[in-house]
């Protein structure tokens, strides 16, 4: 599912509520005990720790045990394309490097629910293509729920079957990508 809306409409707030970072003002969110990960630029890393140390920290915060993380460590590092930077503090990373590492952890340490907040457009063209392909394979797994917030209609058309349109903190429309995106694009133009 994709989520669209102008800046300030509540997209990231909704993802953070689903992830349990804070509670909704009304109603409740029941994830039925499923594991969940939130991929958002600037969320979750300890800047003084190396990329490698942050892989372990992030994995443990997602509910994985150290042996499970160690089993996937090389795959995460390889996918991130960070090379020797993996052992440097993440405070030395560019925003693109930071996002590559965050995406790699989330994509390789597969949780049952993945929340992706505006990060699929970060990185060079090669990494974007690789990220799209990985996301597509994760989405094809029917045992996983993927929710993507993006301002890119092209991204949403490629990856999402359904769209939730938020406006001023309220659901303006929900339906198939083909139904909702044209109306949203017209509204925004």
Regions found by a protein language model. Give the residues of each.
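The feature captures the beta-strand-to-loop junction immediately N-terminal to the Walker
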Residues: 4-6
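ABC nucleotide-binding domain "signature motif"
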Residues: 25-36, 171
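ABC ATPase "signature
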Residues: 174-175
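Conserved ABC ATPase "signature" region
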Residues: 56, 68-85
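H-loop/switch region of ABC-family ATPase nucleotide-binding domains
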Residues: 150-151
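A short, surface-exposed alpha-helical micro-motif characterized by mixed small hydrophobic
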Residues: 156-158
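Conserved ABC ATPase "signature" C-loop
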Residues: 168-169, 184
